[in-house]
Amino acid sequence: MSVSQQLSELASKEKTVLYVADQNLEEVLCFPESTDRTTLVQLTDACLHANELAKHLEFGKPLSITNQYSRGSCVLQIAKEKKDGSGMVVSTTIAAHNALRGALKCSNALDQVISQL
């Protein structure tokens, strides 16, 4: 079974949305691949929350976010360049959805984007 098949299977079983950047922290890969409106809204919401939270707290660049809707939690991985430029430090945060939303509730830009979906 390929990696993409494994990720897709995990995503469907756990009602999980995976958002992952590549090694250059640029390209984004999302599972499950879906055109379902509800799933796309949840996925966009999760990605925006991860990016805005990281930016707001100056954490670095989001590397991946795993949203476990069935468990009501997010696992957020952030990559930040070391001060001496010798590589990246990756930190992992586990938070409830409400905690992520609470940290960003003052973000009008985020609300505007979500309301347009």
Curated annotation (Swiss-Prot):
GO annotation (BP), single: regulation of TORC1 signaling
Inducing factors: Differentially expressed during meiosis.
UniProt signal peptide: none
One GO term describing the cellular component: Ragulator complex
This protein's name: Uncharacterized protein tam1
Taxonomic classification: Eukaryota, Fungi, Dikarya, Ascomycota, Taphrinomycotina
Gene that encodes the chain: tam1
